[in-house]
Amino acid sequence: MTDLSTLRLSYTHGELRRADLNADPAQQFQSWLDAALRSGLREPYAMSLATADREGRPSVRTVLLRGIQDGGLTFFTNYESHKGHDLTDNPQAEVLFFWAEHERQVRAYGPVERLSSEDSAAYFHSRPRESQLAAHASDPQSAPVSNRAELETRLTALHERFAADQEVPCPEFWGGYRIQVQEWEFWQGRPNRMHDRFRYRRNDAGWHIDRLMP
């Protein structure tokens, strides 16, 4: 087995100074995300979403960021999934983006609210038809399924149920969430673990920025 304790990299890609930061953290995030997109990183809009149930048991998974609205981060999922139940019982979450090639990381935390059914349906109908059918087939998400064949059978039945020219309805159990971000952290890797870290915290005046110990 590889001795992981010997594996390390020196981060030399860049630096992050207070003077470089946008006063609006959502704009700062957008600039970093745009840089990741321009450089051709694979799915730089993928984020690790951490939630916790009513007992405080945490869970984490990867979801796709689907928009930035009024400084909030939006994503879509099955409301009956594990994360959906977590967010019903404990409507707060933290997400993390890590762009290894840029030696950058962003964390964002805040309370979570559901999007309107109209906004959820609009996004649902923008998705490929096969993805729309798959959302129906995989309900309830995270529930045990006996085998792959059962899942494929359900998808086949949905193809028969909805003709090719028939609109697939957005399920009531599926839709979007918005994280109303109250705290952001931007991390830039630096040599010898002397990283640059800045935290934005919302206050009555807007946003307060602190440099953090690495």
From Swiss-Prot:
Query: What does the subunit section of this Swiss-Prot or TrEMBL entry state?
Result: Homodimer.
User: Does the entry feature the keyword Flavoprotein, yes or no?
Assistant: yes
Q: Which organism is it from?
A: Deinococcus deserti (strain DSM 17065 / CIP 109153 / LMG 22923 / VCD115)
What does this protein's UniProt record list under function? Answer: Catalyzes the oxidation of either pyridoxine 5'-phosphate (PNP) or pyridoxamine 5'-phosphate (PMP) into pyridoxal 5'-phosphate (PLP).
Its keywords, alphabetically, are: Flavoprotein, FMN, Oxidoreductase, Pyridoxine biosynthesis
Q: What class of enzyme is it?
A: oxidoreductase
Family to which this protein belongs: Belongs to the pyridoxamine 5'-phosphate oxidase family.
What cofactors does this protein use? FMN
**Coiled coil start-end:** none
Q: What is this protein called?
A: Pyridoxine/pyridoxamine 5'-phosphate oxidase
The Gene Ontology terms for molecular function here are:
FMN binding; pyridoxamine phosphate oxidase activity
Example GO biological process: pyridoxine biosynthetic process
Pathway connected to this protein = Cofactor metabolism; pyridoxal 5'-phosphate salvage; pyridoxal 5'-phosphate from pyridoxamine 5'-phosphate: step 1/1; Cofactor metabolism; pyridoxal 5'-phosphate salvage; pyridoxal 5'-phosphate from pyridoxine 5'-phosphate: step 1/1
Reactions it catalyzes: pyridoxamine 5'-phosphate + O2 + H2O = pyridoxal 5'-phosphate + H2O2 + NH4(+); pyridoxine 5'-phosphate + O2 = pyridoxal 5'-phosphate + H2O2
The uppermost taxa in this organism's lineage are: Bacteria, Thermotogati, Deinococcota, Deinococci, Deinococcales
Q: Which residues are listed for substrate binding in this entry?
A: R8, L9, S10, Y11, R66, Y123, R127, S131, R193, M194, H195
Q: Does the keyword Flavoprotein apply?
A: yes
EC assignment: the record states: 1.4.3.5
Instruction: Return the Gene3D superfamilies for the record.
Output: Electron Transport, Fmn-binding Protein, Chain A (2.30.110.10)
Binding of FMN occurs at R61, T62, V63, L64, L65, R66, F76, T77, K83, Q105, Q141, S142, W187, R197
Cofactor binding: number and manner = Binds 1 FMN per subunit.
Q: Where is this region: Disordered?
A: 126-146
